[in-house]
């Protein structure tokens, strides 16, 4: 047997926002590294396409359609999950809106999925003891939110800075456990 420090063999990983983009790529790569994955997204067609692309050699993969902007769906998702070795909080949206055109509706929509959803999912996973010890919780932030700014990117950048701060705080709180 060859030692592979990047192996996820025997691990179970939840990936949110898995219907496309970074979430889809993460799910496929986790499978290639040996993990069984649980993928979730609000988009059933995209989720099904991701599911079809998953390598089958690692056992049973699960797909769950969920709207993570709704707290009751986050709680239901957490209840359905087995104990996890990892969670990739990836679900998110980007919408460029110049400051004079921001509305409360736009701000709340982006905040709900980019900031509140990963915070509430993480809280539920911890409270319901769904994370194994040791385990990993990953958050998708953005250089566009943390290191540089661009016109129309104010609310997106704000949510990504917020999730970066939440990640650091959560790591501090849970790191010694």
PLM region spans:
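Flexible N-terminal pre-Rossmann segment of NAD(P)-dependent oxidoreductases
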Residues: 1-11
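Conserved NAD(P)H cofactor-binding loop of Rossmann-fold oxidoreductase domains
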Residues: 91-96
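A short, exposed helix-loop element centered on a Lys and neighboring polar residues
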Residues: 122-123, 168
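Active-site loop of short-chain dehydrogenase/reductase
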Residues: 11, 83-84, 128-143, 176-177
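Catalytic loop of short-chain dehydrogenase/reductase
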Residues: 138-162, 167-168, 172-175
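Conserved glycine-rich cofactor-binding loop
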Residues: 19-20
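Substrate-binding pocket helix/loop in short-chain dehydrogenase/reductase
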Residues: 98-111
